[in-house]
């Protein structure tokens, strides 16, 4: 999201204030806390009016520095939040010099301009500057017509610096010059819309940045200011982590230590998969023809995947095989296993209102609701479909119980489709903010499975 009109002017319809001068720096139990005023304070009278930003620095692990920037500190910060692996005993050092106060977390340090100086933070490793921010980098913006508040930060880019990341993307691999939005959608694969948006990037200068917000984060990668990566989100608080390398594998190792790592996958999952894809009319004979055809051509298979029409039409997704098309699914799966194949079936987190499973889920309160208490329904994919509320532990257990029956039948794995188009006007059982849950929902869905 762009907040400027060219280089000099603020975008029409917005007001802005920027961190301009360091006012004070204090040590805390786990780092330092600095205040940066939007005014140049040369005397006490200059302190009347105008925002003051609170910037807190700490470390969750060696080589990582956490930055929290706040405008109004009393603003609500509702769930959900990503679970991070924080080392409460991570070592750090603080050193005060003539021009800056240095906070050091092992191989990574940040130098904060001392009180009275123009506000700046410079992130360094091995004696080299990696990135940083200065006056007009950290800012608070308000859209005058709506009263919506935004927090924005800009981190410096070198002339030859290349930026990568942001999750699954279908455009150019190098992100410089792009506007990148963190908003999951049922996108296809030929636009800037994506299924898996991840607010993390890394650069060829040996560091990465993770912006710890589950809601929409907007990145301007050298696209609003050519020498900066800008990120912004609604509200009065911005939290991000600068992660040292120096090699890409070092950045990713530290990043995944912070956010969590996927378990090791079974060896068979790396083999060749064959799918019905979106073939809408197939049965046991069709599947047998596919599998036998691969064998006749000496093409080794590892997994056969049944896409959505293993289910009865208008019954997605009630986890019941279409008995008219698949007479003996247990026996067919056993035959696949005898041929050395694993079996995968397609699922999603939506329930057609025609399926009896919808009534079961509705009666137990397992579906997302509207503010008036009605079940949220849409004809988007299936008639009157509802969405499972994965914020409710009982709903997660119930959903898993349906998968367990398929596993007992012999199914080896699941394709967890959909979940990206969750609306923002719904109410969650645990009270989570519906905008922040839009992206987080797919995480809960996949974690449940």
Predicted regions and their residues:
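N-terminal accessory segment at the very beginning of proteins
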Residues: 1-263, 267-269, 277, 282-292, ...
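Aromatic- and carboxylate-enriched substrate-binding clefts and catalytic-loop regions
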Residues: 70-72, 143, 300-449
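Ligand-site clamp/hinge motif
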Residues: 272
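Append "and occasionally in soluble cytosolic enzymes with long acidic Gly/Pro-rich linkers
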Residues: 293-300
């Amino acid at each position: 999201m762009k907040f400027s009109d060219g280089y000099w002017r603020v975008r029409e319809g917005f007001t802005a204030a920027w961190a301009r001068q360091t006012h004070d720096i204090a040590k805390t139990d786990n780092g330092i806390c600095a205040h940066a005023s939007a005014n140049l304070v040369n005397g006490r009278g200059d302190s009347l009016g105008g925002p003051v930003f609170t910037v807190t620095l700490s470390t969750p692990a060696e080589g990582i520095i956490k930055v929290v920037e706040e405008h109004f500190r009393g603003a609500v910060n509702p769930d959900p939040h990503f679970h991070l692996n924080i080392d409460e005993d991570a070592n750090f050092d603080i050193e005060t010099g003539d021009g800056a106060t240095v906070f050091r977390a092992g191989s990574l340090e940040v130098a904060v301009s001392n009180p009275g100086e123009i506000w700046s933070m410079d992130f360094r490793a091995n004696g080299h500057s990696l990135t940083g921010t200065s006056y007009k980098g950290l800012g608070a913006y308000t859209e005058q017509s709506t009263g919506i508040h935004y927090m924005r930060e800009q981190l410096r880019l070198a002339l030859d610096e290349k930026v990568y990341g942001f999750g699954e993307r279908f455009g150019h691999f190098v992100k410089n010059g792009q506007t990148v939005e963190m908003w999951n959608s049922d996108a296809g694969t030929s636009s800037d819309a994506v299924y898996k948006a991840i607010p993390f990037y890394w650069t060829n200068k040996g560091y990465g940045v993770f912006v710890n917000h589950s809601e929409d984060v907007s990145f301007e990668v050298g696209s609003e200011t050519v020498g900066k990566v800008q990120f912004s989100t609604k509200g009065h608080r911005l939290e991000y982590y600068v992660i040292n390398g120096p090699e890409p594998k070092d950045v990713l190792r530290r990043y995944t230590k912070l956010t969590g790592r996927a378990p090791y996958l079974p060896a068979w999952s790396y083999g060749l998969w064959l799918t019905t894809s979106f073939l809408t009319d197939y049965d046991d004979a069709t599947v047998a023809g596919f599998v036998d055809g691969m064998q006749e051509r000496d093409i080794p298979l590892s997994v056969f995947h049944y896409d959505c029409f293993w289910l009865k039409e208008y019954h997605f997704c009630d986890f019941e095989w279409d008995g008219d098309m698949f007479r003996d699914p247990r026996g067919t799966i056993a035959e696949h296993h005898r041929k050395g194949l694993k079996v995968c079936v397609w699922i999603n987190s939506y329930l057609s209102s025609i399926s009896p499973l919808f009534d079961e889920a509705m009666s137990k309160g397992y579906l997302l609701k509207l503010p008036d208490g009605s079940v949220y329904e849409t004809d988007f994919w299936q008639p009157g479909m509802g969405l499972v509320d994965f914020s409710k532990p009982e709903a997660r257990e119930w959903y898993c119980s349906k998968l367990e029956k398929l596993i007992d039948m012999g199914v080896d794995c699941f394709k967890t489709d959909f979940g990206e188009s969750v609306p923002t006007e719904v109410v969650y059982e645990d009270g989570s903010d519906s905008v922040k849950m839009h992206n987080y929902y797919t995480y809960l869905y996949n974690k449940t499975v």
